Amino acid sequence: MSRRGTAEEKTAKSDPIYRNRLVNMLVNRILKHGKKSLAYQIIYRTVKKIQQKTETNPLSVLRQAIRGVTPDIAVKARRVGGSTHQVPIEIGSTQGKALAIRWLLGASRKRPGRNMAFKLSSELVDAAKGSGDAIRKKEETHRMAEANRAFAHFR
């Protein structure tokens, strides 16, 4: 039996302006080379652009987009015998949000456009409406899990 204790789960901090944990999670994922102030600038510009586009509360659009992209189930490669199977596993809420944010940022980076704030705001608005690359990625993951449902007992 291991002598090591289990690590305490860290709670996500809130960002200074909106006091929102999701915004802070986004900032930490968009961060590159330790330039956190630039990451904050990009996110705050994104929020302003969402406000201009939708004329509703931008944080509710962000919440709705992340809720729409968050997967319930995913597949994990598991080696059984000589072959590797894609085994469907359930995903917790924290891990699901992290995946959703990663997918949203990946989809927005692939988009054509002027700058990251513009691309991310477009992707978030699309995801809130139920379209976009991030939503497609979620649906594809769910399809994969459904197709490999027969291997669920390998968990």
Swiss-Prot record:
Localisation: Plastid, Chloroplast
The keyword Manganese is assigned to this record: no
Coiled-coil parts of chain: none
Stored Pfam families: Ribosomal_S7
GO MF annotation list: rRNA binding; structural constituent of ribosome
InterPro entries: Ribosomal_uS7 (IPR000235), Ribosomal_uS7_bac/org-type (IPR005717), Ribosomal_uS7_CS (IPR020606), Ribosomal_uS7_dom (IPR023798), Ribosomal_uS7_dom_sf (IPR036823)
Keyword annotations from UniProtKB, A to Z: Chloroplast, Plastid, Ribonucleoprotein, Ribosomal protein, RNA-binding, rRNA-binding
KW rRNA-binding (keyword) present: yes
Domain of life: Eukaryota
Family annotation (CDD domains): uS7_Chloroplast (cd14871)
GO biological process, one term: translation
GO cellular component: chloroplast; small ribosomal subunit
UniProt cross-references to SUPFAM superfamilies, sorted A to Z: Ribosomal protein S7
Main location: plastid
NCBIfam families linked: rpsG_bact
Known function: One of the primary rRNA binding proteins, it binds directly to 16S rRNA where it nucleates assembly of the head domain of the 30S subunit.
Similarity comment: family membership: Belongs to the universal ribosomal protein uS7 family.
Quaternary state and interactors: Part of the 30S ribosomal subunit.
Listed name of the protein: Small ribosomal subunit protein uS7cz/uS7cy
UniProt organism field: Dioscorea elephantipes (Elephant's foot yam)
Organism ancestry: Eukaryota, Viridiplantae, Streptophyta, Embryophyta, Tracheophyta
